[in-house]
């Protein structure tokens, strides 16, 4: 099993533990969960932004690299969940990613 497959398996198990089963979702549920996860990603992105000194008007800011790494992983959790809601496998993600990089 490769690392991406393991991540997908771990995310599937986590989602099921918290009550989200992506197997056989209706179109309505898929739309709901894509929106839920996208909103969650917006929040995580805001937290990532707050990890960097972006406030040009504030004097004492530091780059919190450790927190930035945590937020990247949080974003990845939700991104993998969206892929799963859409029925994408690790291979589907890999294929789409490599195809997009050929552009």
Please describe what each predicted stretch is.
Residues 1-103:
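Flexible "arm" and connector segments at domain edges
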């Amino acid at each position: 099993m490769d690392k991406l497959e393991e991540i997908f398996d771990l995310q599937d198990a986590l989602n099921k533990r918290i009550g989200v089963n992506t197997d056989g979702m209706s179109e309505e549920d898929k739309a709901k969960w894509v929106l839920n996860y996208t909103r969650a990603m917006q929040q995580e992105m805001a937290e990532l932004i707050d990890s960097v000194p972006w406030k040009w008007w504030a004097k004492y800011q530091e780059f919190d690299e450790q927190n930035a790494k945590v937020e990247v992983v949080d974003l990845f959790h939700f991104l993998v969940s969206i892929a799963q809601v859409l029925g994408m496998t690790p291979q589907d993600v890999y294929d789409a990613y490599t195809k997009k990089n050929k552009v």
